[in-house]
Amino acid sequence: MRILGLDLGKKTIGVAISDPLGFTAQGITTIRRANKEKDMEELRKICDEYKVETIVIGLPKNMNGTIGPSGEIAMEMGKLVEEALNIKVEFWDERLTTVAAHKAMLEADLSRSKRKKIVDKVASTYILQGYLDRISK
């Protein structure tokens, strides 16, 4: 059983995949967004390659727990993904995942240009790992 984690951005989608047993998450790519059809095509290829059964999408929430405009966009994207790929979609609170990703990359002494290229992939790993930790309990 493989689970895919997504960090949705305006320009890119960070993608992470679980190991076959569903214990650990690993970032695999960053999709440069084009349009809905091409985005779905890229996701379909990944889902087919890894035999994905569930997709976890980071849900941006406000610090008080409410869902704002970005969260609504993520939920719409989730519906689109579920319908287009016929794969179950779950949402995971992504508050502070990008902050955590930046902090980890700074501690690893990565250059600004390198951080910019991989931040969404790293954030998707945090999203998916949080979900995996929760379902394993």
Swiss-Prot record:
Any idea what job this protein has?
Could be a nuclease involved in processing of the 5'-end of pre-16S rRNA.
According to the UniProt record, what class of enzyme is this?
A: hydrolase
Residues that span the membrane, as ranges: none
Predominant location: cytoplasm
- Organism's domain of life? Bacteria
Report the source organism: Clostridium botulinum (strain Alaska E43 / Type E3)
Q: Which GO terms describe its biological process?
A: rRNA 5'-end processing
Q: What is this protein called?
A: Putative pre-16S rRNA nuclease
